[in-house]
């Protein structure tokens, strides 16, 4: 039931993308659900845990985000958490059924000194038998490769394109 890399289409034409975009919403949901059911048991869910490893002080101006330093929120600027705190939370997540542990930081982009810390976090969390995920802002290609090489499974990056933000 697991998806093979050969099943992933990555050569979409503009017309094909437009055809998907123009689908009525319920038809789009049906097609998405059909693909999901083809490759996954529809009655199973994956439990993931997200932990903020560095809270507050992000220089970006996303109006909806409490992490932004540009708005008056109740979020205090905190330093990056020590590795021991992160591993303790990852173990707790695993022991409570999570199979993926995502670490998020309020950064615009990743500095080299923070990259070294995050690489160690990824290695240690991976050693616990968890899938690893991070959301750290913008990365260079080299940084992405370095994270991949230490075992990172997933990278989340929010793309905020609304004129409202």
What are these model-predicted stretches?
Residues 69-165:
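Conserved Radical SAM active-site core
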């Amino acid at each position: 039931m697991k998806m093979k890399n050969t099943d992933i289409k990555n050569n979409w034409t503009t017309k094909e993308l437009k055809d998907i975009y123009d689908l009525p919403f319920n038809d789009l949901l049906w097609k998405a659900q059909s693909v999901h059911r083809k490759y996954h048991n529809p009655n199973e869910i994956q439990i993931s845990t997200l932990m903020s490893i560095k809270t507050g002080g992000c220089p970006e101006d996303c109006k909806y985000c409490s992490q932004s330093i540009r708005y008056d929120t109740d979020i205090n600027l905190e330093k990056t958490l020590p590795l021991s705190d992160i591993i303790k939370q990852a173990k707790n997540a695993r022991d409570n059924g999570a199979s993926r542990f995502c670490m998020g930081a309020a950064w615009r982009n990743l500095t080299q000194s923070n990259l070294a810390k995050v690489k160690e976090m990824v290695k240690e969390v991976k050693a616990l038998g968890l899938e690893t995920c991070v959301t750290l802002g913008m990365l260079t290609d080299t940084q992405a490769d370095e994270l991949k090489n230490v075992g990172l499974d997933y990278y989340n990056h929010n793309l905020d394109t609304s004129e409202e933000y």
